[in-house]
Amino acid sequence: MKFFSVSLALAACLSMAAAQGLDGLPDCAKSCATNSIPASCGLDVKCICTDSSFISGISCCVLQSCGPDQQQEDAHPFFPTAAVEFANRICKTAGVTNMPQSPSCANTTQSATGTASKSSTATSGSSTESNASQTAATATTSTTPPTSPTSPTSTTGSTTSSAASTTNTTTGAAVTQHKDIGLIALAGAALAAFGLLA
C-alpha cells in the first residue's frame, strides 16, 4: 500500500512537471513545438528525437513566428535556445542525447514550373487564335508565295512562351488537442512500471 502511494505521488509530480514544461514557452513557441513533430512518428518520443527535422523545425519556426518581444523574456533570455533546450529535455527522457545545442534555420526553397502557348493562323482574311498567358515569346513566321494569280497568300505563325507558377508546400504533424499528451503518457508508463514492480 505504501509503495502504491509513493508511485501515485511520483506520477502526480511527473504530470505537474510535464504540464509546466510547455507553460514556460510563449504561445508561438508552443505551436512550433507541436507542429514540428513529424507526422510519421505520432507521439513516439524516440522517433521524434531521432528525426533530424524536429529540432530544425522548432528553431526555424520560433525564429519566424515569435516576435522579438516574445524571444526576450526574464525566464528565457533567447527563446530559440529555450526551445532547443526544451527539445533536449524531452529527448533525453527517451535516451537520445546527441541533439544539437544551438538553433538553426535552413533556407527554404521554392520551385516554379509551367508552360503556356499561343498559336495563330490567318488565311484569306479570316483568323483564329488560341491564347494563354505569356511572359516571354519567340515567333516563327513562314510565307508561301502564291502559285497562281488568284490563290490567296497564307501566313502561319506560332508563339510559344513559358509562364511561372509558384507552389509552396508546408507539412507537419497535426496539432494535438492536449499539447502535453506525450509527457502525460510518459508519466502513465512510469506509473504502470511502478505498479508492475509492486
From Swiss-Prot:
What's in the GO CC field? extracellular region; fungal-type cell wall; plasma membrane; side of membrane
Q: Where is the composition biased (Low complexity)?
A: 108-168
Q: What happens when the gene is disrupted?
A: Increases susceptibility towards the chitin/beta-glucan-microfibril destabilizing compounds Congo red and calcofluor white.
> Where is the CFEM domain positioned along the sequence?
20-119
Q: Where is this region: Disordered?
A: 99-168
The domain of life is Eukaryota
Please give, as recorded in its UniProt entry, the membrane topology of this protein: Lipid-anchor; GPI-anchor
Signal peptide limits: 1-19
Lipid positions (GPI-anchor amidated glycine): 172
Enumerate the subcellular locations listed in this protein's record, separating them with semicolons.
Answer: Secreted, Cell wall; Cell membrane
Q: Where does heme bind?
A: 44
Record GO terms (molecular function): metal ion binding
Glycosylation site residues = 107, 131, 168
Disulfide bridge positions per record: 28-66, 32-61, 41-47, 49-91
- Propeptide cleavage-removed residue intervals: 173-198
Q: Does the keyword Metal-binding apply?
A: yes
Keywords for the protein's UniProt record, in alphabetical order: Cell membrane, Cell wall, Disulfide bond, Glycoprotein, GPI-anchor, Heme, Iron, Lipoprotein, Membrane, Metal-binding, Secreted, Signal
Q: What is known of its domains?
A: The CFEM domain is involved in heme-binding and contains 8 cysteines and is found in proteins from several pathogenic fungi, including both human and plant pathogens. The CFEM domain adopts a novel helical-basket fold that consists of six alpha-helices, and is uniquely stabilized by four disulfide bonds formed by its 8 signature cysteines.
What exactly does this protein do? GPI-anchored cell wall protein involved in stabilizing the cell wall. Not implicated in virulence, heme uptake, and biofilm formation.
What family is this protein classified in?
A: Belongs to the RBT5 family.
Protein name (record): GPI-anchored hemophore cfmC
Name the gene for this chain: cfmC
